[in-house]
């Protein structure tokens, strides 16, 4: 799998167009010969489905067309000179609180997409015009094609302030999109679809959205609907995104896929994030080696899952030395997400990037996804500019031509997400040699002590008598040597310590949770360990 170097890019894109003035309707512009023509009849999800079915019958146009020379070779510094003019924003006519800006083609974004805008099912495509952008010091040719298209778009809304215009959601590159809740800053991304992610043959395929229809509904609507047409060599698809802004903005997603050819590994509702440094893998990534003052660097710090039996599983993320893939049986899955639990500035010490404000994306199926696994892929990275974490639901049955796939889900942009359940939750994961400092006990290189801090739920009740607690553990390719629990008053919770002897050349899979008698008190902590990582 290829890492996606886009951290610097996406951070800079948020500055390409700030503030929105009085909106102008693009529908009134003269399109001219060759411009995309408006679709005057009422248009909806079924129309996108029909287009995806027709598209499936034809070969994929995998290679994007050549851009005009002035845009073909743009580096980042030149590309970011191209800024959308705020006064040209769309959707605001008629009093809507939503507004739309388009991204220009260039740099890494060379595949044009068509963006249609409208209300209540009546759409018109946005024609390309140099009037939409400020090009900085770039010298443009006298004529550019009116059907050039755009790289993507973003929608603004008064998310944090009734009089403001904050970025709500962005679609840019392949099938990537990101959205925000109140007082959040962009971090991880979602994708429309993942194909063959995590395979060692590096044969991952990146589907792309080729056309969008954005419906702001009426002026009083607090929802914007986005239809999207997906394409790739292996599959086509129709998507509907109903976006509702709020403290924890949500998106209801409906999908229908039409495979062109077999796909071995299909990833539904994929999430992509970055994890470079954290407290649980400092033995792997010595900050001194990177000359790094920040204690932690990550957009997400764990994978959270809710099983069919309402067990909550927390898997801390790590930056491994080599690619690692872990799969969790997930028949009847009720939810999963990549979370940024640690919301403390002190953990990151970054006054510009504010990792403590990165959102957590939580996915809940709203249809039957059938049998499958939640797959977590962790790639090695040497800095924070590369996305190295992928999580998705992978159905047990492969994708086959002639077999349509339909599914739906809800996505929410949360904070820490610890209030999703009322149990104790994992606060931190640490590791150390499995012996006390200065102890005469011999050191076994295959033995390691894992320490897990649990807080919340009813754990503070047991602070004065932790003997009432039992530690449930599980191990694969490893043996639990000893386990014990001690109070941690600093978090009003408990610290569980597990000494584990691992098998040579195998990945040890561990699990731990706290209970009192028959009553489970915490979510289940899960982890994968390679002894040669030490």
Predicted regions and their residues:
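Extended, loop-rich substrate-binding clefts of extracytoplasmic carbohydrate-active enzymes
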Residues: 189-246, 367-386
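N-terminal secretory signal peptides and thylakoid transit peptides that target proteins
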Residues: 1-17
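Signal peptide processing junction and immediate N-terminal pro/mature segment
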Residues: 24-32
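Solvent-exposed N-terminal domain segments of exported/luminal and surface proteins
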Residues: 59-199
């Amino acid at each position: 799998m290829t890492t996606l170097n886009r951290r610097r890019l996406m951070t800079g894109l948020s500055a390409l167009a700030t503030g929105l003035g009085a909106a102008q309707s693009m529908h009134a512009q003269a399109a001219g010969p060759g411009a995309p023509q408006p679709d005057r009849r009422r248009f909806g999800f079924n129309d996108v489905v029909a287009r995806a079915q027709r598209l499936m019958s034809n070969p994929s146009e995998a290679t994007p067309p050549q851009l005009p020379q002035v845009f073909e070779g743009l580096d980042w510094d030149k590309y970011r000179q191209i800024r959308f003019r705020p006064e040209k924003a769309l959707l605001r006519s008629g009093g809507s609180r939503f507004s739309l800006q388009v991204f220009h083609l260039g740099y890494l974004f060379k595949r044009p997409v068509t963006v249609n805008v409208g209300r209540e099912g009546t759409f018109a495509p946005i024609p390309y015009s140099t009037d939409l952008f400020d090009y900085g010091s770039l010298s443009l040719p006298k004529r550019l094609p009116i059907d050039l298209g755009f790289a993507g778009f973003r929608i603004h809304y008064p998310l944090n302030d009734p009089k403001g215009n904050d970025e709500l959601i962005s679609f840019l590159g392949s099938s990537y999109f990101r959205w925000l809740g109140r007082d959040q800053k962009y971090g991880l991304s979602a994708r429309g679809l993942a194909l063959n992610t995590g395979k060692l043959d590096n044969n991952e395929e990146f589907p792309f959205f080729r056309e969008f229809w954005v419906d702001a509904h009426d002026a009083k609507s607090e929802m914007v609907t986005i239809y999207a047409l997906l394409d790739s060599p292996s599959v086509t698809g129709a998507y509907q995104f109903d976006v509702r802004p709020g403290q924890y903005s949500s998106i209801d997603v409906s999908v229908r896929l039409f495979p062109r050819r077999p796909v071995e590994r299909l990833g539904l509702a994929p999430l992509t994030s970055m994890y470079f440094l954290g407290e649980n893998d400092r033995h792997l990534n010595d900050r001194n080696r990177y000359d790094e003052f920040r204690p932690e660097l990550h957009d997400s710090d764990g994978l959270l899952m809710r099983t069919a039996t309402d067990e909550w599983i927390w898997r801390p993320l790590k930056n491994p030395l080599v690619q690692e893939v872990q799969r969790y049986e997930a028949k009847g899955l009720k939810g999963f997400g990549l979370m940024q639990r640690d919301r403390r500035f002190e953990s990151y010490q970054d006054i510009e990037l504010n990792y403590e404000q990165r959102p957590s994306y939580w996915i809940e199926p709203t249809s039957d996804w059938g049998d499958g696994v939640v797959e977590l892929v962790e790639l090695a990275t040497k800095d924070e500019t590369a996305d190295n974490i992928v999580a998705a639901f992978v159905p047990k049955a492969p994708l086959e031509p002639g077999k349509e796939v339909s599914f739906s889900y809800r996505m929410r942009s949360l904070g820490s997400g610890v209030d999703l359940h009322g149990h104790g939750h994992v606060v931190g994961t640490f590791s150390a040699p499995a012996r006390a400092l200065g102890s005469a006990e011999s050191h076994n290189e295959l033995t390691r002590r894992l320490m897990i801090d649990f807080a919340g739920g009813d754990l503070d009740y047991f602070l004065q008598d932790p003997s009432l607690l039992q530690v449930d553990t599980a191990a694969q390719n490893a043996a639990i040597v000893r386990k014990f629990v001690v109070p941690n008053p600093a978090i009003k919770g408990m610290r569980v310590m597990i000494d584990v002897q691992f098998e040579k050349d195998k990945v040890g899979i561990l699990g731990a949770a706290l209970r009192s008698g028959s009553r489970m008190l915490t979510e289940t902590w899960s982890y994968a360990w390679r002894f040669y990582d030490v």
